[in-house]
Amino acid sequence: IGLVSEGGQWRIENPIDALVVPTSFFDRSFARFNLYFFDQTGRVLLPDPVFIPRGEQTATNLVRGLLAGPGDTIREITRSALPSRTDLDLSVVVTESGVAEVPLSREVLQATPAELTRAVDQLAWTLRQVPGIDRVRITAGGAPVPLAGGRVDAPVTSGSQFDAGGS
């Protein structure tokens, strides 16, 4: 950091355009999670590490991250199963029975059944990291979006076939 004398006082010459916080504050306020995106072949879900503010909006922030797409480091090698231009209508609600209700915009209704299954798998992999979430349910316009087999939700263990580690 360069310093310059200005009017008899020392000033930082080229301050960075960022907020600098102590590590203790960051560790207390944020938690590391992974957003999961499919590789270009669609056979593997790859993690994209992010830091999310701790609190009751963790699931909402994770879904917003998925909808924003992968970060720069993996953008070229991944893709999202969530339909483009899909938005989160409200906050993700986690019911007492552990169902994460993900209210998406109506664009999700344009997905084919296969695309919807992959979108649920992508959401499940990402949301399984949140304690208390056991199942995922996508809604659009306030109504559950039907999944393959007439189901309206899926366990967070969905998509185990996409594990690169084979576990």
Where do the model's predicted regions map?
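Bimodal "functional hotspot" detector
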Residues: 1-167
